[in-house]
Amino acid sequence: RDVLGSRGLGDVYKRQDYSQVKIFGADESPAQFKDAFRRINELFITEAKKYNVGKQLKKEVTEISLDAVNQVNENIDLTELMTAKREYTLSKEQIKAAINALPIQKTPGVGMVFIAQFLDKSNNRGTYEVVFFNTETKEIIEEWITDGKARGFGLRNYWAGSIYSALKKL
């Protein structure tokens, strides 16, 4: 997808926001997931070549910042993380609220965030809302749902595998 078109790129931030996610069918505790979420985000720095959003979009990423999502992810309500429902999607209002909640500098540019929606262990799938937004106004430019097959050894790598699969669909 050429989401940005001829638009000036500015700064594109790539990150995982887990503040809205629901998890189905997993044996791990909410606290284990919260720790895994932080470690998954670190992969965007430590394994930047593998998790290269810019390459997929054919655009230069001028900054990778995890500060904003680390702050919102730190405030995840562990009692709300797990669900017994087999489906879950975010409303437009929840998506807009998630973008508005990101504590970012209001500088000109385009931000990108993967908002995790649903991690379904029974189907080995992670579902994500891909959101591009104006970093100055937080106006949403474009958004769509994608998913990826979860795979890998250990909690972090398993769900990071779903992000990697989802990135390939950009």
Predicted segment positions?
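Short secondary-structure boundary motifs at beta->alpha junctions and helix caps
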Residues: 136-170
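Solvent-exposed loop/turn segments at secondary-structure junctions
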Residues: 18-20, 117-122, 148-151
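Solvent-exposed, acidic/flexible segments
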Residues: 88, 92, 126, 152-160
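N-terminal segment of the mature soluble domain
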Residues: 18-107, 111
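Short secondary-structure boundary/capping segments
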Residues: 12, 27-31, 127-129
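Single conserved hydrophobic/aromatic residue that forms the stacking wall/gate
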Residues: 2-10
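Mature extracytoplasmic/lumenal regions of exported proteins
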Residues: 94-139, 143
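Short, hydrophobic/glycine-enriched beta-strand segments
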Residues: 11-17
